[in-house]
Amino acid sequence: MSDFKKINPSAINESVFDLIGKDWALVTSGNSDKFNTMTISWGGAGIMWGKPVAFTFIRPQRYTFEFIENNDYYTMSFFDEKYRDALKLCGSKSGRDIDKVAETGLTPAFTEDGIPYFAEAKLVLVCKKMYAQFLNSESIVDNDLSLIHI
């Protein structure tokens, strides 16, 4: 992976609330022959079944969904603010219709195992898919975190 170094997930100092909710990210899946990416601003990170995990929600209608479904790995790439326009484009246009790499100028890169991410990212999470579930409105509990006591 270019100039990136592997770190323990617990060494990530940024707030997951800021990284995903405020800064946004690109979720990318596929291989060096064909991949797609889309902007995410929903998701989180934590511990599941004793392992560090990151998760996001992708509607089945999204082109990236096909890539996530057909591959065991995906990446979450986080960027500095100067890439906001690229993230806006990747969240509003479909890879079925445009070449997002050409339109944004972002540089695709690949892990040793061929998992796609973007070289301009400040942080990349390489994620192995361990669970997927279709959501329906009955399975969502709307408890916001507006009351936090410390």
What does each of the following model-derived ranges do?
Residues M1-I148:
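Active-site-proximal mixed secondary-structure blocks
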